[in-house]
A protein has these predicted regions:
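Basic, polyanion-binding surface patches
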Residues: 2-186
Length: 186
């Protein structure tokens, strides 16, 4: 630990403060990257689309709100993901939010080499044609605005068009390599 004097002119509490010594910095390699982000909790959604060759969908933890006006979101999808060709060709998509008890749906849509829309998945189509998960407590329909190749992923930006909520729900999270739920502090 180091002791540092605070500048009374810029601090509301003049005096001394104890701050930790500088941490050892390391180069970020793939293992470090994975380790750091395993500790970053993220919401879990299933993104679905259809470009005319049948439904495709995948589990995502990369959904980000980007803009309020216009309402934009973004998400990342691997360049090798089986759903990428459909997402790349689709003009629109659905973001299916999952509740805390729906980790089996999240796992199914994260599994490679299976028909994710086969039983026991319950799904239907919106009147606009996109596949939507019948058990999702809420969803957003988005119109694809941009696609960018970034590293080993593609970033997709979608303008949100419609929203429906079947019920209020506690979100499903992903943290430290497993599904989790919120535990409010207060």
């Amino acid at each position: 630990m180091s002791v540092h004097a605070l500048n009374p002119a810029t601090s509301g509490n003049p005096g001394l403060a104890v701050v930790p010594d500088r941490l050892e910095e390391r180069t970020v390699d793939a293992d470090t990257f994975r380790s750091v982000f395993r500790r970053h909790a993220a919401g879990v959604v299933v993104i679905t689309a259809d470009a005319g060759h049948g439904p495709a969908g995948f589990t995502a933890t990369s959904l980000v709100s980007v803009s309020l006006l216009p309402p934009l979101v973004s998400f990342a999808i691997s360049t090798t993901a089986s759903s990428w060709p459909t997402v790349n060709a689709a003009d629109s998509l659905v973001i299916n939010f999952l509740d805390a008890g729906q980790h089996e749906i999240a796992s199914r849509f994260a599994t490679s080499g299976i028909d994710r829309f086969a039983e026991p998945t319950r799904w239907s189509r919106l009147h606009t044609g996109e596949p939507v998960l019948d058990e999702a407590p809420s969803y957003l329909r988005g119109l694809v605005e941009h696609r960018f190749s970034v590293g080993d992923h593609h970033i997709v930006v979608a303008r949100l068009d419609t929203h429906a909520e079947r019920r209020e729900h506690e979100p499903l999270l992903y943290h430290d390599g497993r599904y989790a739920t919120t535990d409010p502090l207060v």
